[in-house]
């Protein structure tokens, strides 16, 4: 047990500081913005300090663990802890949220509430990644849904209410399955009901019961990840949300589904996961092809990027279902990699919209001459998204490939077929990304418009773009920086399986 409650402070600090902002006298939008950014920077520094001085990378067990009796009934504890699986996602959450608050500078309407919701979402996400109690995990999972709904409904586009309603129906509906799974695991695991994840990891269940629990959790995480056909909320949500909200959705929210799939389905229910993994592998492969072929048909810029996210999530599903060391490591690396790339693309799409007030690609064109800095950054990050060598996406997808090739679970012919289909998906990716860049930046449409002029990327936007680009290149050149965090934990999870 840790002496100092680092994780409790890290989880509670953003929402507490955000609540304070609501009750203090209104001092203007600029004060609210800088206050929120200072909170995020302080939180990120605190998290980094706590992990640098207290986290041992060669230890696969839970570290910085805390446990406080919360509710006597049902043996409910406030349990926190991190391991190699959660440390990367927590640091990613801090980094992307800090940059998203900086990206939200143009928001002026109800800025106090807007920034409070971003901080509340921050707490919910870090709480989900650091919870070591199943019911606490569920509470944190639900906590971040409310801010996302309000951010969508109040600061979105013309169809924001439709998108927000669709989002909450999908996510709240899937949460019912999550709650049933949580209660089922805790009540039927042993004679003594427990919500402690460490104890539940050592439990065994009747096969039928384990399959039912697995399906319940899978539905909940499939909506968040998302896995087809439960993905339809994502393009609508991204298409209408403010781009700072899109950064949080693409960078962190989707990763919660992948994290839950590894943390609960794979770690707690290994027998059921072994049975379902071939089906997940097929779904992941179809998802790559489906999203990559659907994306070029999207007129809306942000919807096209959203479908690219769905395609990239397919690699995470394949990595998880390979049940191999390289496959799972590649999936974790893809979680971090796409967190940066997805957030960056939505930010640049938003900055372009701020200038031309157009969202449909067939109305754009000829912007490269007027905004060369945004054009350059968008081109580089599009290359990162299509897995250019030297970028983080390339390494992640390559390791997932190795994971499938080395898997002992599948026949050679099925592995060759899966790899062939994945390769087709990787060929389709440059088609929709490069055509998107061509429609936006080349041609003469906007140049020929009378009195056409707008300013290029300012210092704030350039700083944001470069801040996200640096880790993408850094991970691409030296992926072991991320892989070393989770490698021992991955081996620990795979020790429950008979192959890999």
From Swiss-Prot:
Question: Where in the cell does this protein reside?
Answer: Plastid, Chloroplast thylakoid membrane
- Which reactions does this protein catalyse? a plastoquinone + NADH + (n+1) H(+)(in) = a plastoquinol + NAD(+) + n H(+)(out); a plastoquinone + NADPH + (n+1) H(+)(in) = a plastoquinol + NADP(+) + n H(+)(out)
Report any one BP term from Gene Ontology.
electron transport coupled proton transport
Q: Where are the transmembrane segments?
A: 4-24, 35-55, 87-107, 113-130, 134-154, 167-187, 211-231, 242-262, 272-292, 305-325, 330-350, 386-406, 416-436, 462-482
In which domain of life is the source organism classified? Eukaryota
GO terms of molecular function: NADH dehydrogenase (ubiquinone) activity; ubiquinone binding
Membrane topology qualifier:
Multi-pass membrane protein
Keywords attached to this Swiss-Prot or TrEMBL record, sorted alphabetically, are:
Chloroplast, Membrane, NAD, NADP, Plastid, Plastoquinone, Quinone, Thylakoid, Translocase, Transmembrane, Transmembrane helix
Q: What class of enzyme is it?
A: translocase
The record's listing under Pfam families reads:
Proton_antipo_M
Q: What is its EC number?
A: 7.1.1.-
Q: Which residues form a coiled coil?
A: none
Query: Per the record, GO CC terms?
Result: chloroplast thylakoid membrane
Database matches in PANTHER family = NAD(P)H-QUINONE OXIDOREDUCTASE CHAIN 4, CHLOROPLASTIC, NADH-UBIQUINONE OXIDOREDUCTASE CHAIN 4
Return the HAMAP family for the record.
Answer: NDH1_NuoM (MF_00491)
Question: Can you tell me which family this protein belongs to?
Answer: Belongs to the complex I subunit 4 family.
- This chain's protein is named NAD(P)H-quinone oxidoreductase chain 4, chloroplastic
- Source organism lineage? Eukaryota, Viridiplantae, Streptophyta, Embryophyta, Tracheophyta
């Amino acid at each position: 047990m840790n002496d100092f409650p680092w994780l409790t402070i890290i989880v509670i600090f953003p929402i507490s500081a955000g609540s304070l902002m609501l009750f203090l006298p209104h001092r203007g939008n600029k004060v609210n913005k800088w206050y929120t950014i200072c909170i995020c920077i302080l939180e990120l520094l605190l998290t980094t300090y706590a992990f640098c001085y207290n986290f041992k990378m060669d230890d696969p067990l839970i570290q910085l663990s805390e446990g406080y009796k919360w509710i006597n009934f049902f043996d409910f504890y406030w349990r926190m802890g991190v391991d190699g699986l959660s440390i990367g996602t927590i640091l990613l959450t801090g980094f992307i949220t800090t940059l998203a608050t900086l990206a939200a500078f143009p928001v002026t309407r109800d800025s106090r509430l807007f920034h409070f919701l971003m901080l509340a979402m921050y707490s919910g996400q870090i709480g989900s990644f650091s919870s070591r109690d199943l019911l606490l995990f569920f509470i944190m999972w639900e906590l971040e849904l409310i801010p996302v709904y309000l951010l969508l409904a109040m600061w979105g586009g013309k169809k924001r209410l439709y998108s927000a309603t669709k989002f909450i129906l999908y996510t709240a509906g899937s949460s019912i399955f999550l709650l049933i799974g949580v209660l089922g695991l805790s009540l039927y695991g042993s004679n003594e009901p427990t919500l402690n994840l460490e104890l539940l990891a050592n439990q065994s269940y009747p096969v039928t019961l384990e399959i039912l629990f697995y399906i319940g959790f899978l539905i909940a995480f499939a909506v968040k990840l998302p896995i087809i056909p439960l993905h339809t909320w994502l393009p609508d949500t991204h298409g209408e949300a403010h781009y700072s909200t899109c950064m949080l959705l693409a960078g962190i929210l989707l990763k919660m589904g992948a994290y839950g799939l590894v943390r609960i389905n794979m770690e707690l229910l290994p027998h059921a996961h072994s049975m379902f993994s071939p089906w997940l592998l097929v779904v992941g492969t179809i998802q790559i092809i489906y999203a990559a072929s659907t994306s070029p048909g999207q007129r809306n810029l942000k919807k096209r990027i959203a479908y690219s996210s769905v395609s990239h999530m397919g690699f995470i599903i394949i990595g998880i279902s390979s049940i191999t060391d390289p496959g799972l490591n590649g999936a974790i690396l893809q979680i971090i990699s796409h967190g940066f790339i997805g957030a960056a693309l939505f930010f640049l799409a938003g900055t372009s919209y701020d200038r031309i007030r157009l969202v449909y690609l067939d109305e754009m064109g000829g912007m490269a001459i007027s905004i060369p800095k945004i054009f350059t950054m968008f081109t580089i990050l599009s290359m990162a998204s299509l897995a250019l060598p030297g970028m983080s996406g390339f390494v992640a997808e390559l390791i997932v490939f190795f994971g499938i090739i080395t898997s002992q679970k599948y026949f050679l012919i099925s592995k060759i077929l899966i790899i062939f289909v994945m390769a087709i998906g990787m060929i389709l990716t440059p088609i929709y990304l490069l055509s998107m860049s061509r429609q936006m930046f080349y041609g003469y449409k906007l140049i020929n418009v009378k009195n056409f002029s707008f300013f290029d990327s300012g210092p704030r936007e350039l700083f944001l773009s470069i801040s996200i680009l640096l880790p993408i290149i850094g991970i691409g050149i030296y992926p072991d920086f991320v892989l070393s965090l989770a490698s021992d934990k991955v081996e620990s999870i795979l020790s429950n399986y008979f192959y890999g």
